[in-house]
């Protein structure tokens, strides 16, 4: 029973880490961008198009409403 509880807690921590990794990486990336300035990294802003484009603005608004 103790082993199952430990495995469950470790899995929860790993899932939480995975779900928050995007926020951490975006914060690090914005810090790097501010260090080098906007002019040096203007062309790298095109990487935003790599994300899934099927999420509409209405979906984003709905998710923002849920997070309030």
Curated annotation (Swiss-Prot):
Range of residues in the leader sequence: 1-23
Per the UniProt entry, the propeptide covers: 38-68
Swiss-Prot/TrEMBL keywords: Amidation, Antibiotic, Antimicrobial, Fungicide, Membrane, Secreted, Signal, Target cell membrane, Target membrane
Q: Does Secreted show up as a keyword for this record?
A: yes
Free-text tissue specificity from the UniProt record: Expressed by the venom gland.
Q: Which cellular compartments is it found in?
A: Secreted; Target cell membrane
Any GO BP annotation: defense response to fungus
Modification sites for Phenylalanine amide: 36
Gene Ontology CC entries for this record: extracellular region; membrane; other organism cell membrane
In terms of superkingdom, the source organism counts as: Eukaryota
Similarity comment: Belongs to the non-disulfide-bridged peptide (NDBP) superfamily. Short antimicrobial peptide (group 4) family.
Q: What else is known?
A: Negative results: does not show antifungal activity against Candida glabrata (ATCC90030) and Candida parapsilosis (ATCC22019) (MIC>400 uM).
Indicate what this protein is called per its UniProt record. Amphipathic peptide OcyC1
Lineage of the source organism?
Answer: Eukaryota, Metazoa, Ecdysozoa, Arthropoda, Chelicerata
């Amino acid at each position: 029973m103790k082993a199952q509880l430990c495995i469950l807690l470790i899995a929860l921590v790993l899932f939480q880490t995975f779900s928050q990794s995007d926020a951490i990486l975006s914060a690090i990336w914005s810090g790097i961008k501010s260090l080098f300035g906007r002019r040096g990294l203007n062309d790298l802003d095109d990487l935003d198009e790599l994300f899934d484009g099927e999420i509409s603005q209405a979906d984003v608004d709905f998710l923002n409403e849920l997070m309030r």
